[in-house]
Amino acid sequence: MAGSGCAWGAEPPRFLEAFGRLWQVQSRLGSGSSASVYRVRCCGTPGSPPGALKQFLPPGTTGAAASAAEYGFRKERAALEQLQGHRNIVTLYGVFTIHFSPNVPSRCLLLELLDVSVSELLLYSSHQGCSMWMIQHCARDVLEALAFLHHEGYVHADLKPRNILWSAENECFKLIDFGLSFKEGNQDVKYIQTDGYRAPEAELQNCLAQAGLQSDTECTSAVDLWSLGIILLEMFSGMKLKHTVRSQEWKANSSAIIDHIFASKAVVNAAIPAYHLRDLIKSMLHDDPGRRIPAEMALCSPFFSIPFAPHIEDLVMLPTPVLRLLNVLDDDYLENEDEYEDVVEDVKEECQKYGPVVSLLVPKENPGRGQVFVEYANAGDSKAAQKLLTGRMFDGKFVVATFYPLSAYKRGYLYQTLL
């Protein structure tokens, strides 16, 4: 969908018009060499979810930078328009152009607004690593996305933690940033991938390009599997591996280094069966791209058959439309029907201050005994409630508010959360 052009000064205005609607620019989310991303919300449509405005070619950009921005815009637009509809790929709402002056157009993509990135999750879990539940969730979602885009003939070519984001509404991880993507067999990008997540064949190709030499072969979808293997190893270890994967020790025997990482973690938590994850990661990190496991085959790994449960930290970090309140009801309330109904009504009334409540559940038996599960109409209301209810006093006790997987809640599956 293309929108009409509109005037925009050097600084982002509070409002802009696109697609026949007025949009409020609320804040800048981030910026790079060729684009900036802003949080925007459609005015006059109460309850509409916010969006992400990716603006290419910021004011003052000229020359090679301007060409790179235009190229990145065209690449990302083409890829997203062809790959639309997959739940693990960011949704493109539309495309429009802003004119800072008659000769300086700024291309814009309006995208769905996502939540926390894997990069942020790695910072939170530094040194201790992510839970197996989170690693499994992320691995499955990214592999589903890769299997789809590889089937469509695309290579993402810049898979890294910052480009994998959580969707609170869809309760899954999604891929973003297709500015370096290309059609397999038609690699029109010389320099691909980010340092630390770059496959050996891409590293060689980049070195040759810097020397002004042409590579004999093009990179394939296997480069994406290498990047994912490094990301999963970082999530498991809690360590950045940029220097490790560039070391001579890694090049000599990466398998032994992976074994050492898993062995050291096994000492900390021997109860977790991690060998299936280890084998999956190894299958993604063969130096020979021809031996690397394809995404579709990786989804058949026995690692995905293990029913891991989330840690409480996972349910704090990953927003969903469902809120779980702890430390609210004790046994006295649960065993007295009148008091139980009164306190449940009080809790519901308090929760409705943050948005429409679809359902509310307070189990009287385990699992979940005494916990309050609140399903909101959308994740935005749930996030607002979680932020404001955490630490509140209720009947003399501090409330602890976490999120809870909507899919599990709908099935009546109440996890025994790991602490």
Curated annotation (Swiss-Prot):
Pfam families: Pkinase, RRM_1
Protein localization: Nucleus
Protein's name according to its UniProt entry: Serine/threonine-protein kinase Kist
Family in the record: Belongs to the protein kinase superfamily. Ser/Thr protein kinase family.
GO biological process, one term: neuron projection development
Keywords: ATP-binding, Kinase, Nucleotide-binding, Nucleus, RNA-binding, Serine/threonine-protein kinase, Transferase
Residues where ATP binds: L29, G30, S31, G32, S33, S34, A35, S36, V37, K54
EC numbers, comma separated: 2.7.11.1
Reactions catalysed, as given in the entry: L-seryl-[protein] + ATP = O-phospho-L-seryl-[protein] + ADP + H(+); L-threonyl-[protein] + ATP = O-phospho-L-threonyl-[protein] + ADP + H(+)
Record text on subunit structure and interactions: Interacts with PAM and CDKN1B/p27Kip1. Interacts with stathmin.
Presence of keyword Disulfide bond: no
Induction entry: By serum growth factors.
Domain RRM, first and last residues per copy: 323-405
GO cellular component: axon; cytoplasm; dendrite cytoplasm; neuronal ribonucleoprotein granule; nucleoplasm; nucleus
SMART domains linked: RRM, S_TKc
The keyword Protein biosynthesis is assigned to this record: no
Main location, first listed in the record: nucleus
Functional summary from the UniProt entry: Upon serum stimulation, phosphorylates CDKN1B/p27Kip1, thus controlling CDKN1B subcellular location and cell cycle progression in G1 phase. May be involved in trafficking and/or processing of RNA.
Gene Ontology terms, MF aspect: ATP binding; protein kinase activity; protein serine kinase activity; protein serine/threonine kinase activity; ribonucleoprotein complex binding; RNA binding
Domain Protein kinase: 23-303
Residues at the catalytic site: D158
Superkingdom of the organism of origin: Eukaryota
Enzymatic class: transferase
